[in-house]
Curated annotation (Swiss-Prot):
InterPro entries: CXXC_Zn-binding_euk (IPR008584). It comes from Dictyostelium discoideum. Zn(2+) binds at residues 32, 35, 64, 67. Requires a bound zinc ion for normal folding and solubility. The keyword Zinc applies. This is UPF0587 protein. Belongs to the UPF0587 family. SUPFAM superfamilies: MAL13P1.257-like. One of its GO terms (molecular function) is zinc ion binding. PANTHER family: CXXC MOTIF CONTAINING ZINC BINDING PROTEIN (PTHR12857:SF0).
Length: 156
């Protein structure tokens, strides 16, 4: 079993927080821990998809094409909605319990919630292009997210 977290880092202007929506689908590339096989296709993983393996509920059950090993991933319950993040510093966006696989790549895509410095929430934000901007008329401020980078870490 390997627990991993995904963090983002970006240049932020007038942004207080970024976190995945409840229905966020995480697009990942995974590597089999047994044979090292990395499929070419992105795998979509979301909390609402629950599969039963033995006595466990998992969000993804997959079989490695290289060695036929059964593997699984569970998205851990976390709440990032009440924090404040800083520009150009890593901030965690998800944790995973991986059995038989390791996360190799992450593609942010869509379904993010962005909170401005004034507290206004923007829903269904798409970060696929690596940047996002909006003008908040109420406060006459420009909101920007630039140079998004992701990192994957093993955690205890």
């Amino acid at each position: 079993m390997v627990r991993q977290s995904i963090s983002l880092k970006a240049e932020l202007e007038e942004i207080q927080n970024i976190f995945p929506a409840t229905y966020k689908i995480f697009f990942l590339k995974i590597k089999c821990s047994n044979c090292g096989e990395i499929p070419d296709k992105w795998i979509g993983l979301d909390k609402s998809n629950i599969e039963v393996i033995g006595k466990s509920n998992v969000n993804l059950a997959t079989k490695c094409k290289g060695c036929n090993r059964e593997n699984s991933i569970v998205i851990e319950d976390t709440d990032y909605s009440s924090r404040t993040i800083e520009s150009e510093k890593d901030f965690e966006i998800a944790r995973f319990d991986c059995r038989g696989v390791e996360i190799e790549e992450f593609d942010p895509r869509d379904n993010w919630i962005v909170v401005s410095s004034s507290g206004k929430e923007y829903k269904d934000v798409d970060l696929e292009e690596g940047e996002w901007s909006e003008f908040e008329e109420r406060t006459s401020t420009s909101l920007t997210i630039l140079s998004i980078e992701s990192s994957i870490k093993k955690i205890k």
